[in-house]
């Protein structure tokens, strides 16, 4: 209950002569709305002679009925507070919040009560608006019964007609209905309201430093069932959807987040502005028919349901129920994940789920200011409205939502910036104290968004601050289909998309595409279709006759997928194709066996019954085709995410930079459901050199840690590495972290080498027998220990440059030199 407002105005009253209930009501139509011991303020007569009584089920009522004598409210302040007043010995307002007043056998009215020591036992005091509404005369005896609302009788939204209470107070200046609605919720939160109730409302316009006293009449009330609405919003399957829809009620209790709408009285000079004016703001506190696709959000149903359960479900219950539980609301949510997954779009819609105060959306860098202390002041300003409302009405305060985009810009780890007095540290300290400091606020919800969760100060991530941490990951196939339907809805509506376009097939082919990349794919397909209409010639101009026939077809999507849009968390096809530029030459059953082992390991990773994490190293001499075999394994695995870590990508990196690059690669791989990580040439990555020896211990330790860390639940990772020095890996302990080791052999027989030579297609069939005979002789020599396939291909390419008659002797001479260690 909010305290009775303190007003300084003291007015006189005129005694009302009463003969009967109806005769008093006719006389009082011209009496004052507010009365005190000195004067009155005239108001316009009410539009209705008698408001209908709320029809309430008997189960809503409690016993302990008493007879009371009607008295007038002690002061204007009491009237403005909108309570009926009784002595504590009759009803204690700490135990009884509302009463039902029966002035006659066919009528009853619901009031919220307050104790007042000036009211004698057996008396109940009402303000003039209440006495007019219930047609109560002074000294009239009424039956009063304690009353309790059921959970289905809470106010979701309420429409009130408003007018100036006196002609002398009429002004043409616009009144902000949004500020009025906020002030109304603060003053009257937790009170009972009935259809037709008359009341006085004093609104202080702080922007213009003016005070207005208005007469209000409750026009309609839309209620909802708190329990069923919360269950439906959180995804309960057994909830009747019709039971959660708002419905008209005769009486209900006002909640802090109830939607208040003001309509001006017919013929009134009142000028209202803002979203809470008229029917524009007429909406329920929770929309059970919330449609993510209409809001432009797809693939995030699970995330929304989880956030509602953790952060919003508790806020739809009455404050007194939360106090009985001793519960504190969640004050913060952190949305993190890869770029383009819909974090910002999700945050824009979160505030609309409860119809709370208009969210304050601020970019992280906007907080920073060049002047000393202004950055901290900007943080304090964001919480100023919530602090003021919390001081005034405590638990009855409405929800204030503050959204920080790119929160990592202002909430980095303290001490990570240069200088001990960095402005970033003081901003973090200010935000920490506002969210959960000495003066705790229970009416705020801070939503932060970032791509770099690891940069956020750990004190901000504890319970009580950014307590709910939700990863917004890449959409699955169902989510991708929802997103594609959203971005193609207008095209389908206006028949601008060929009906043969199969969005389900596109969603299957766009593995690991983010929401932003899917939007870009649709945009690229549209551009491809529009390009067909551009006339060829010196000037670029569209063909006006073909514009009406424009239709985006499946070919446009295929072209966009092939050439325009590549997912950031997709396959590194460019790197894989570079490693396989010579193709995959199966020179013997050894190659087939190696590829089969790789396929078996990939299938093991895919199997949901297994752990989903395997590591393998391809070890062999230099130029034996290890990288090509690893690339072929990665490509044939058909995993949507393939990342290549190559020494050439880290040239010039410091040891710390290499470790960060490795860590980021593993983190990116673990964000995808199915991932392959190819680490090429471990020795070069570690900076190993046998002279010394010299190597990077920091990189080795990073690899030991990362290769031992399995992916999160539901994610699967296959790590393939290559190495030319098996002894070094064993000495450094790296061999122990690889679950499987596959040896890559050299070509040691003439038949194996002939398979490669035949694939080159540079020798005629007549030359091949002589080459095979000479190679067999070389292989039998004591100095020949085999040749790597890459080395053999290099020799063949060198021979290709010769004239046709010299290709055979050139190749054989180089092979003989290889046997004599001339080409090692």
Curated annotation (Swiss-Prot):
GO biological process: Golgi to plasma membrane protein transport; intra-Golgi vesicle-mediated transport; IRE1-mediated unfolded protein response; SNARE complex disassembly
Catalytic activity: ATP + H2O = ADP + phosphate + H(+)
Positions bound to ATP: 582-587, 622-629
Gene3D superfamilies xref list: 1.10.8.60, 2.40.40.20, 3.10.330.10, P-loop containing nucleotide triphosphate hydrolases
Cofactor annotation comment: Binds 1 Mg(2+) ion per subunit.
Location in the cell: Cytoplasm
Cross-referenced CDD domains: AAA, RecA-like_NSF-SEC18_r1-like
A Pfam family reported for this protein in Swiss-Prot or TrEMBL: NSF_ATPase_lid
E.C. no: 3.6.4.6
Keywords noted in UniProt: ATP-binding, Cytoplasm, Hydrolase, Magnesium, Metal-binding, Nucleotide-binding, Protein transport, Repeat, Transport
SMART domains found in the cross-reference section: AAA, CDC48_N
Family per record: Belongs to the AAA ATPase family.
Protein name: Vesicle-fusing ATPase
Natural source organism: Caenorhabditis elegans
């Amino acid at each position: 209950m909010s305290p009775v407002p303190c007003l300084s105005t003291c007015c006189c009253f005129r005694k009302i002569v009463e003969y009967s209930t109806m005769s008093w009501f006719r006389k009082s139509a011209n009496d004052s709305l507010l009365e005190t011991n000195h004067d009155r303020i005239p108001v316009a007569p009410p539009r209705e002679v008698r408001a209908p009584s709320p029809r309430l089920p008997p189960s809503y009522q409690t016993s302990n009925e008493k007879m009371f004598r009607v008295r007038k409210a002690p002061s204007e302040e009491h009237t403005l507070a909108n309570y009926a007043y009784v002595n504590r010995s009759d009803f204690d307002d700490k135990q009884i919040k509302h009463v039902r007043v029966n002035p006659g056998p066919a009528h009853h009215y619901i009031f919220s009560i307050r104790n007042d020591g000036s009211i004698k036992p057996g008396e109940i005091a009402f303000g003039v608006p209440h006495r007019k509404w219930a047609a109560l005369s002074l000294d009239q005896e009424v039956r009063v019964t304690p009353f309790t609302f059921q959970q289905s009788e809470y106010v979701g939204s309420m429409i009130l007609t408003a007018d100036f209470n006196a002609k002398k107070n009429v002004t043409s200046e616009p009144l902000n209905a949004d500020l009025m609605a906020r002030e109304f919720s603060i003053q009257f939160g937790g009170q009972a309201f009935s259809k037709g109730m008359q009341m006085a409302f004093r609104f202080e316009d702080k922007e213009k430093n003016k005070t207005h006293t208005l007469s209000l009449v409750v026009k309609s009330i839309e209620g909802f069932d708190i329990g069923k609405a919360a269950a439906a919003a959180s995804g309960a399957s057994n909830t009747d959807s019709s039971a959660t829809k708002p419905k008209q009620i005769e009486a209900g209790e006002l909640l802090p987040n109830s939607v208040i709408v003001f309509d001006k009285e017919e013929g009134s000079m009142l000028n209202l502005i803002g979203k809470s004016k008229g029917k524009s703001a007429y909406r329920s506190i929770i929309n059970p028919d919330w449609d993510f696709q209409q809001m432009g959000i797809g693939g995030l149903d699970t995330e929304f349901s989880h956030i509602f359960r953790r952060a919003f479900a508790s806020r739809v219950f009455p404050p007194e129920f939360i106090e009985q539980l001793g519960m504190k609301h969640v004050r913060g949510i952190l949305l993190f994940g890869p770029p383009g997954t819909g974090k910002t779009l999700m945050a824009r819609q979160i505030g609309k789920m409860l119809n709370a105060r208009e969210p304050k959306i601020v970019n992280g860098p906007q907080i920073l200011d060049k002047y000393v202390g202004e950055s901290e002041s900007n943080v304090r300003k964001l919480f100023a409205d919530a602090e003021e409302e919390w001081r005034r009405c405590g638990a009855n305060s409405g929800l204030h939502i503050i959204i920080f985009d790119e929160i990592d810009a202002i909430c980095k780890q303290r001490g990570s910036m240069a200088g001990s007095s960095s402005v970033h540290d003081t901003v973090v300290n200010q935000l920490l104290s506002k969210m959960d400091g000495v003066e705790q606020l229970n009416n705020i919800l801070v939503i932060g968004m970032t791509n770099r969760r690891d940069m956020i100060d750990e004190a901000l991530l504890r319970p009580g601050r950014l307590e709910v941490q939700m990863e917004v990951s890449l959409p699955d196939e169902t989510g991708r289909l929802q997103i594609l339907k959203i971005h193609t809805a207008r095209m389908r509506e206006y028949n601008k998309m060929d009906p043969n376009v199969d969005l389900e097939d596109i969603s299957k082919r766009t593995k690991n595409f983010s929401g932003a990349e899917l939007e870009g794919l649709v945009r690229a397909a549209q551009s491809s279709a529009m390009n067909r209409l551009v006339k060829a010639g010196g000037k670029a101009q569209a063909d006006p006759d073909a514009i009406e026939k424009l239709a985006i077809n499946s070919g446009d999507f295929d072209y966009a997928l092939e050439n325009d849009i590549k997912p950031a968390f997709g396959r590194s096809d460019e790197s894989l194709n570079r490693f396989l530029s010579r193709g995959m030459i199966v020179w013997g059953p050894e190659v087939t066996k190696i590829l089969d082992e790789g396929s078996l390991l990939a299938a093991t990773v895919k199997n949901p019954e297994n752990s989903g994490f395997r590591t393998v190293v391809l070890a062999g001499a230099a130029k034996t085709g290890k990288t090509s075999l690893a690339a072929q394994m990665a490509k044939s695995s058909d995993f949507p995410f393939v990342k290549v870590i190559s020494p050439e990508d880290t040239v010039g990196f410091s040891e710390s930079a290499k470790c960060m690059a490795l860590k980021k690669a593993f983190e990116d791989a673990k964000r995808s459901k199915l991932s392959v990580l190819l680490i090429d040439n471990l020795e070069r990555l570690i900076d190993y050199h046998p002279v010394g020896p010299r190597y990077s211990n920091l990189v080795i330790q990073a690899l030991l840690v990362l290769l031992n860390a399995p992916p999160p639940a539901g994610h699967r990772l296959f790590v393939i590495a290559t190495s030319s020095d098996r002894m070094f890996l064993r000495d450094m302990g790296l061999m122990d972290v690889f679950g499987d080791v596959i040896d890559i052999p050299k070509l040691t027989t003439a038949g194996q080498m002939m398979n490669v030579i035949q694939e080159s297609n540079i020798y005629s069939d007549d030359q091949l027998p002589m080459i095979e005979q000479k190679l067999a002789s070389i292989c039998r020599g004591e100095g020949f220990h085999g040749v790597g396939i890459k080395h053999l291909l290099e020799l063949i390419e060198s021979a290709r440059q010769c004239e046709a008659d010299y290709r055979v002797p050139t190749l054989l001479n180089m092979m003989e030199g290889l046997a004599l260690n001339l080409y090692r």
